[in-house]
């Protein structure tokens, strides 16, 4: 067990154990120099840190650090954002006052020549149509009704002239201008467009033209609806034509006169219509196909059969001419037969007892019944 040497003042010595090769005074001097070395080392480390910090800050600073601004304490900006203040650009010099450009002077347009007003023409100024000559063709069918309407127009114009119209109105009357008139006596008048129900009494066959009759099946009242002017049982007489065209399905019938049971008669001159008001009367149409084409077909077949039989019965040298002659003869006969029968008109059949209608085409005046009990 070694004992530590004590200091002269009774304390323990600083160096333990003493180096036997170093003198005692050398150990004491070495002990006094050790704190100074530590101090110099700490100062060197601090200076190195300060130098390294300065170098890092100088490298991390932006190139225009001199133009950076520091915001006030209360308006601190978030870190990492740098704002640069650029110098204010000088204001541009004011432009000198320029005189205003004068307004361009445009050439004045030339005035257009005045347009003359259109000539003033009298109303309904048109030429008088040439009068049609009355002939036998006007006495049947639509032509008969046109002639009747023309006569009625002349009578109406004559009545207006008798009433004492002005000179202008007389001028208009001469130009076939219709004037509004007040029809009197509606209790004794049938107006155009009145429908009369009728039952056909005779059969119609259009091979030849002829007459036909029908019986009124329902009372016909006046324009006012207060009086029966055409009673049931009135007989109506009309006529039909035989010129039914190819493809037609209706026959035209013109009713000419009414015969009432009381003995009164009146001219009618109105067309026949079907139950719906369509013009003409429908019926069963026979187009006569067999009569028109049967003879030609038969002759054509006979010609082919004759040619075939002659070709088999004659020899090879002389049979050719005979065959051609027979074929040509049969073809000529077939063409002639077709020309004679192709224009046969069809026939329409309309049975008696069928319900038909009559459409009144002009005003009918029954003033003769005034004051009677008819």
UniProtKB/Swiss-Prot annotation:
GO terms for cellular component: plasma membrane. Component of the type IV secretion system ptl required for secretion of assembled pertussis toxin (PTX) through the outer membrane. The keyword Nucleus does not apply. The chain crosses the membrane at residues 38-56. NCBIfam families: T4SS_VirB10 (NF038091). The keyword Transmembrane helix applies. It holds the Pfam family TrbI. Induction: Cotranscribed with ptxABCDE. Activated by the two-component regulatory system BvgS/BvgA. Keywords: Cell membrane, Membrane, Transmembrane, Transmembrane helix, Transport. Residues 92-117 have a biased composition (Pro residues). Residues 86-117 are annotated as: Disordered. This is Type IV secretion system protein PtlG. It is a single-pass membrane protein. It is found in: Cell membrane. InterPro entries: T4SS_VirB10/PtlG, T4SS_VirB10/TraB/TrbI, T4SS_VirB10/TrbI. Belongs to the TrbI/VirB10 family.
